[in-house]
Amino acid sequence: MVMMAGMDDHERKIVQEFCHLLEKSKQLFNGLRDLPQYGHKQWQAYFGRTFDIYTKLWKFQQQHRAILDTKYGLKRWQIGEIASKIGQLYYHYYLRTSETSYLHEAYSFYAAIRGRAYYSRAAKEDRSDLMVKKLRYYARFIVVCLLLNKMKLVRELVQELDTQIADYASTYEPEDQVEWNLVLEEIKGFVKAESAVGVLHADSNPVVLTHRLGPLTSPPIERSPPMCLTLQEILIVGNSADQVKFSELSVDMFRMLQTLEREPRDDPTHMHDASPAGRLPFRPGPYPPENGMPRRENPHKYLLYKPTYSQVQVFLASGFKELPANGALLLYLSADGCFSTVKHPEEMGYDLGGVTTSNKRDPEHGKRLSGGKEPHCLYPGDLYPFTRKPLFVVVDSDNSYVFQQIPRYFGQPLMVLMSPQETPSTLRDVRHGGSLFTLFLHSPLAAFCLICNVGSLAVHHWERCQNYVERFLIEASRLVIRSRCDIFDIGL
């Protein structure tokens, strides 16, 4: 509780306004978790109000730092907490919009916390909850750095997190010590799996590879009248039981997410700034119109880690609903197979099985009755309603082939890309670190090196091989685009 005695009217008003802004920001931030994860109109206005209040709060504490330090007792970890909340806002806005520019904004505020050591005295407060805030900050910062391919910084942060967890455990002997050690192991396993092949400079330092879309990595596209579709909505589902993951993101999901994004544009004004001091968080606005239609840098994505059947259907329906004219929906499934016991299949949409969905939130409801279908399974027939609009399905599963018979009842474009059902015995252990099929989609050369047991190679060899891959992609793209459209009327 702040003591108002000993303050003049001006100081009292400043402290009261700060307390009001701080409390209002907490209320709005806590309300974010109640917003639906799907749709657009349902949450954009609320996010806008939350950004507005945090902008005012950040500006206010900058302008009145001296009074807040002496009269309110503002501590550095409290400033760090505000910066951390702003970083979280930008990260979650990225998740909801798929625009990578917001990742840079999140990175800027997270980097400021580390650069200015806002949490450096958290341990001296002798409060375990502050240490937990610090550990959570590290975990969130690592996720953002992973998505921005700042691997050198990721390794530094992992080492720092390791030290912080050890200090936390020795000081407080907390009940959640095992959970934090598990988080640390997940991060280390994820970083190890993510680098399927090591590319080295002449001095043996690793090269940071990027596999997002960019001018140098995307084949040039010749626009023609039949090319009227654009990818607008994406649903990425990860439900492989034995696969490395971190923060609700499996390795397969992480790779596919980057494969379907354009390379982030570095902002030179604060990419290397140690602090966001002197600048304000900006409120994300509507996408700039292009020819009267909203334009987005990237297709909108939903990321679902081990979702239930109901969740898959809800998010699919939301993406389907949001599709504009001439828009296409992409569904990516990385999941274990759900196999059928039907000896004489009649209904191809359900009798051959599908891929598993989670039952963790619904263990009792919908148990399989004798002779009935598995309720916690996504069947090919479940996708039939969504073929009313252009649909692209990518299935990475040991039961992928069952999706090859999806009919085109509504005459809309449909493509189904399926993984092999089996992996050579010598490569079966690889799936724990990510599916080979998804790795080929993400980085064909890295996948080729993996199956050839090439763990590392010099950067000049990598670049030479990559040139061959790019030449193939350019030629393949040219042939596909110039081919007759009706050859894609069947699922591939």
Locate each region found by the language model:
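Active-site-proximal C-terminal subdomain of hydrolase catalytic domains
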Residues: F392, D396-L492
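Short coil/turn linking the two alpha-helices of tandem helical-hairpin repeats
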Residues: L32-P36, G87, H92-S98, I142, ...
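A domain-level signal for caspase-like cysteine endopeptidase catalytic cores
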Residues: V208-H376, P390, V394-S397
